[in-house]
Amino acid sequence: MPSIAVRTFTDPVEYFAGIRNLQIDGFVVGRGEFCAKSTRIDLHRLWMHRFDEDLPRIMKVTPSGTRAGILFALRRAQPAMQVNGIETSQNQIAKFGLNRDWYHRSLASCEWGTMSLTREDFAAVGEAMFGHELVSSSFTGSVAPPATALSRLRNLHEAAGHLAKTVPDILARPEVARAIEQGLVEAMMFCLADSPFEDMRNVQRHRARIMRRLEATLAANSEQPLYMADLAAQVGASYWTLRDCCLEYLGMSPRRYLWLRRMHLAQRALRRADAERTTVTEIAADYGFWELGRFSVAYRSLFGESPSTALRRAPDAPRT
């Protein structure tokens, strides 16, 4: 039975958690109040999403291990996104496999979409249409489809999103859903078939291993701040190696990445804390910010409100 969900998010943590089939660890890197819209459409075999985000962000993506698919820009004139440090322009799509983590970075506000099938369905459709499988289990890479194929994919994806928002009852009808699904799957396959691609499997294997160790270290210290000396020691790499890896995959130095991580940890702590029992100064110090004035200015610039306002609000209460 087809299902549809259209949602708006102001909390990036909830937004990342709401992207189904992918485990996402990420945070916003732009300044201001976050807002994102998500349209999810589950057809018979095909799952698709449409996303509209107003601030740049970095996401480390862990696939579910059951579905492979593609992502692409929905707007023809928007800044390029990056997948594993490789630019994916509005004339390309990125395809991702079943079991390899990858990074997705936006440089500004963006609209992007995804489509996915199970490995078995992907293999069956690829064999039926072209005689071979089109997405491997570990592959993540950029593809440059023919302009006509990509245009058709975008148009069908947009039409499905429009139906989901305006007349969802029609899209939920099995015969309509099946027809749209067939058109979308066919369009996706023609984008993937025989398209030149930039293969990331054999590029920078050493840096990919460093990034996996970096993320494992961050995961092991998910609720506490890390500093450069500790990070380099636990990852087993020099600062310069970490810097090169982070610049390629994340678009920023490891020092900046750790600073942003500490800021987001402090934001989470402020939102969860009881203002009667703790202070902004205590929370800031817990996460390595000892100059309260500088912290307050940076916090307001990054999140659009003062840390004292975040603390006074009841836990999990929405912003007004």
Predicted regions and their residues:
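Alpha-helical bundle regulatory/interaction domains
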Residues: 1-33, 79-222, 227-229, 233-239, ...
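N-terminal low-complexity or simple alpha-helical regulatory segments
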Residues: 1-66, 70-72
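Short, conserved glycine- and acidic-residue-centered signature motifs
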Residues: 63, 207, 259
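Well-ordered mid-protein domain cores that form the structural environment of catalytic cofactors
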Residues: 47-49, 55-102
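Short hydrophobic/aromatic patch on the recognition helix
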Residues: 242, 246, 294-295, 299
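Generic hydrophobic, amphipathic alpha-helix propensity
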Residues: 210-214, 258-263
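Conserved glycine-rich phosphate/nucleotide-binding loop
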Residues: 285, 297, 303
